Amino acid sequence: MIHSFARASLLLSCATIAFPALAETAPTAAASTESAAAESGPQIIVTGDVLYSNQINALKSPTPIIDVPQSLSITTADQIVRQGFDSIGDIVLYTPGVTNSQGEGNRDSVVFRGVRSTADFFVDGVRDDVQYYRGLYNLEQVEILRGPNALLFGRGGTGGILNRVTKKGVVGENFVGYRGSVDTFGAFDIWADVNLATSENSALRINAAYEDLNNHRDFFDGEQIGINPTFRAELGAATTIDLSYEYVDHERFVDRGIPTGADGTPVRAFKRITFGDPDNNLTTFTAHVLRGTVQHAFSDSLKGNLTASWGDYDKAYSNFFTTGFDPATNVVAIDGYVDTTRRKNLVLSGNLIGEFATGGINHVLIVGGEFIDTSNNNDRFNAVFDTAVADGRRADVEFFAATRPLALRGGVGTLADGRTTNVAFSALNDDTEADLTIFSAYLQDEIKLAEWLRVVVGARFDSFDITVLDNRNGAVRTRTDDKVSPRLGLILKPQPNLSIYTSYSESFLPRSGEQFSDINPPNDALDPDTFSNLEAGVKWDIYPGLALTGAVFEIEQNSPQVSDANPDTLDVINSKIRGFEAQLQGQVTDWWFLSAGYSYLDGKQQSRTGPTGLRVRELPEHMFSIWNNFQATDRLGLGLGLTAQDDSFADNSNTATLPSYARIDLAAFYDVSDNVRVQVNVENLFDELYFPNAHTANEVTVGAPLNARFTITGRF
């Protein structure tokens, strides 16, 4: 690992020194960002040290970033385009303290400070917990907040959350933006952004995208369609209404990676083999989401907002994947299943934000509530191999030679012993209907005791009520969890551009899990998992436009488990994750934008009797990323980046290892005119073979080799 980091860091350092020599005086990226923000209206933007909005956002109040006692990172739409990001996973790679999990080839999955999540996603501050791949076509920016914090986000958020801020109508303007790109794998996309001023006080904005998917793996293809019309109306100076509808339609091949070998590392010889059925490894996802927000200023010191969101989601995925590999015989064990989810979500949330003073002490008080009503129907059918049944073995596993391609297609395969097998998804494993109702109320006070001292104190009450019907046997199980989650923060400000803070926050996850598919015994008798975050950090605005942040933290998970048939006998399984994060981001000079992040993570699993000696899975000890934008001339810009991770374990038993890696990326962009830009992004410049993430020890993702993306963007 040391050699990989040293080699990559040396290359990057040399290039970082060399590129500025090309630079000439040019308009700054900060100016460009501010100009773009002005054109796109009052969205959540970064201007100096303030994250502000007259809309709901992840922080729920207009709070200077420097005064937030929690680690957070923001990726703007401009950064998304310049760095060539085309997925949430790309953004995560360049964010400290977080990394990607595999998501079984059918969903986003982020590891926040060592805690894996497929549900801690939000859109404009509203929960978006269905499992799918989220697009970037309609975003102003992406916010990643780290550390458990149920006060603002409710259940989950056990290691952090990711919030997408969408584009809204811009009153008084007419414009059309577009993007088209194609990469060396053959994938391409087309984005459109159209804003129409429908009156002096209203605007209609339509964002749409079509993406044709392809990559370096056999059989992979797919498409993504997104359409998001939004309407904004300003009803006088004090009231704004935003309405939106989003239609999402995804279809893609499911690739769950390759197995590990006898040495516990991914089998490099399998880098081109897809262990699945080209006709049956498939996921589809359709969503219809309606959202409306009303914001009103009752006075200069009291504002309120109310959001209603309704979503209808339909997802299915079928897949075959490896569960084991025998190096002596070159034989893999193949398992499979098909899973469907039909979900409807209603979310109502509201906040009152007041600013007032009591006895010379200033307050920013947030009072809020949330109601969630969810119905979820989930079923799973396991694969049945007729040869396994005939042999009297487990029906959903068979053994194939590790060949390219795997001898399985259309449900018919040739086994390692030469026999023909037929497989169908016919064994019912689960069929549940869940109804979930959540009532929440929260209160937070940001107290300014003096110019140099601020305190944040608050708490949230959640009542989580779930009923699950098991259609296999008609059993109905219910559970209600009432939880209070506190948040405390202390901020010292020796000077206006410097904050030193400490904070404590909690969150919880009911035993029905992130996707609440069941509460079968013994889970119906167990309390929720609880998570706490103790953090201390510093935020320093070195000068306007350049900020340095750092934090040390400890996350503790408490997960009660039944150790035998008696639910009264529990074995409490804990994990403790300690770490350090640092980030430097902003305009170093008028021609150099820098975003750099580092994290150190150390996590151990614990039982009731103490530490087990095992490390938490998917927890690289060291992670580092850096991205530079250099404005070489008035029209030419260059980008250079590095993302690197230490080795980590793919499983909790610490038997499978993901090797360390370092990947270097490049970019060049040229402004053909004031309204048209062409650019090229090169990923994995030195064609490193790497394995960035996994789902289990036998499902390891193969990183993409050297590739390039060519993009044209414009606006008129």
Question: Where are the model-predicted features located?
Answer:
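Acidic/polar loop-and-plug regions of large Gram-negative outer-membrane beta-barrel proteins
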Residues: E211-N215, I227-A297, W310-R343, V389-N429, ...
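Outer-membrane beta-barrel translocator/receptor signature
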Residues: Y137-E140, L151-P229, L235-T239, H288, ...
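Membrane-embedded beta-barrel scaffold of Gram-negative outer-membrane proteins
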Residues: Q295-S309, Y313-N319, K493, I500-Y501, ...
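Gram-negative outer-membrane beta-barrel transporters
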Residues: E451, A551-E556, D571-S653, F686, ...
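Structural signature of Gram-negative outer-membrane beta-barrels, strongest in the C-terminal barrel
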Residues: E234, R343, N362-I366, E370-T374, ...
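Repeated loop/turn-to-beta-strand initiation elements of outer-membrane beta-barrel proteins
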Residues: N201-L204, A238-I241, S301-G304, G360, ...
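C-terminal beta-signal and adjacent terminal beta-strands/loops
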Residues: A644-D651, F669-F716
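Acidic, small-polar-rich N-terminal luminal/periplasmic segments of exported/outer-membrane proteins
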Residues: S40-E173, A536
